[in-house]
Design a protein with these regions (language model features):
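Extracytoplasmic
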Residues: 29-32, 40-42, 60, 129-132, ...
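Ligand-binding clefts/hinges and TM-proximal coupling segments of bilobed small-molecule sensing domains
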Residues: 62, 68-78, 150-222
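Short beta-strand-centered segments that line the small-molecule binding cleft or hinge
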Residues: 16-19, 30-37
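Pocket-lining segment of extracytoplasmic ligand-binding domains
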Residues: 11-13, 21-22, 87-178, 183
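Short, small-residue-biased leader/transition segments that mark boundaries at the very start
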Residues: 1-7
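An extracytoplasmic/periplasmic, membrane-proximal ligand-sensing/linker region
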Residues: 95, 99, 105-106, 116-118, ...
Length: 243
């Protein structure tokens, strides 16, 4: 967490850090705790090729899977693995969301993994310029994915989120506020109070504010909660795990 009191992270990356896995292999980070879950960030597999209907169809294709070692990169590897594919089974490109969208529009890649709250600007822009499709995940492979990586949540992206794109089943990770353990209980309590006592105002000022929900906020399992957050949620009737 560095010098910041609190930052926003993702449930999968938090788990990697706390357990010393993947990009944190051999270097576990234990000095932070969960404050609250905010909203879901969906794994969106984007293509302009109507013949790519399943993750299995990505074999042999040119696919952007995010910067090497990034959270998106590991999300892509997890989903490929659920379909018995590896990084070597595709022509992997390591691009950010904007460059991936440009490459899709120009026909330079066949598909891209984008992990962000839907609607995502890069995909919205692409869908207005070119026929765009989201590649869905089926129940069998979602279950397989969750067995090895329980921080993935099933999620259905509604029809109309992007122009011409039907309802699509995928998975998501949770955008979460975390805090250093040495931040005072009162400070973290006040952060929770400020967010969740102003949900109506936040919903009016930001699309993601509409997704704020107390029960969801208290649902993180990847990393225990800060004592200040636990105090706030207890007042609202929710017990959360602490260190």
């Amino acid at each position: 967490v560095g010098s910041e009191m609190c930052i926003r992270d993702r449930s999968d990356v938090m788990s990697y850090a706390y357990n010393g896995e993947r990009l944190f292999e051999g270097y576990p980070v234990s000095g932070f705790s969960t404050v609250a879950a905010l909203y879901m960030e969906q794994v969106q597999i984007v293509t302009c090729d109507p013949d790519i209907k399943s993750v299995a169809d990505l074999k042999g294709k040119t696919v952007s899977i995010g910067a090497s070692g990034s959270g998106v990169y590991y999300n892509a590897l997890d989903i490929l693995a659920a379909y018995d594919l590896t990084e070597e089974d595709i022509n992997a490109q390591y691009q950010d969301f904007g460059n991936s969208a440009d490459a899709l529009q120009d026909g330079k890649i066949d598909a891209a993994f984008v992990v962000a709250g839907a609607p995502t600007v890069a995909i919205t822009t692409l869908a207005t310029a070119k026929d765009t499709y989201l590649v869905g995940l089926d129940d069998e492979h979602i279950a397989k994915l969750q067995e090895s990586s329980p921080y993935y949540e099933e999620y259905v992206i509604p029809e109309g989120t992007y122009e011409g794109v039907p309802e699509t089943k995928t998975v998501a990770v949770v955008a979460t506020v975390i805090a250093r353990d040495d931040v005072s209980e009162d400070d973290v309590y006040n952060i929770c109070y400020t967010i969740f006592e102003n949900m109506d105002n936040l919903a009016q000022s930001h699309d993601k504010g509409k997704e704020l929900d107390l029960e969801f906020a208290a649902s993180v399992t990847a990393v225990p909660y800060h004592a200040g957050a636990a105090k706030y949620f207890a007042e609202k009737g929710f017990d959360v795990p602490t260190k």
